[in-house]
């Protein structure tokens, strides 16, 4: 669980660096990635996630989020716009 805790904190901190809206879709749930509590209740390593990124720094946010998800072995794709 400690590894998952580190992933949640780092994902939320990374997302907070960007002004874009970053929403994680996990099946039928949508979670603001800047919300540590939302991530704690949703993030599991064996699930596929989809990120929806909208805003002025969306391209940088997408790259940063993919990097941090991959670092923690989490399966994520960017949703088509």
Spans of model-derived segments:
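Short, charge-rich amphipathic segments
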Residues: 1-6, 75, 79
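Amphipathic alpha-helical interaction surfaces in cytosolic regulatory modules
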Residues: 3-17, 32-45, 59, 63-66
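Conserved NTP-handling cores and scaffolds of large molecular machines
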Residues: 18-19, 73
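Conserved beta-strand core positions
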Residues: 20-22, 47-51
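Short, glycine-/small-residue-enriched flexible loop/hinge segments at domain edges that mediate gating
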Residues: 25-28
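C-terminal structural segments of small proteins and small subunits
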Residues: 50-81
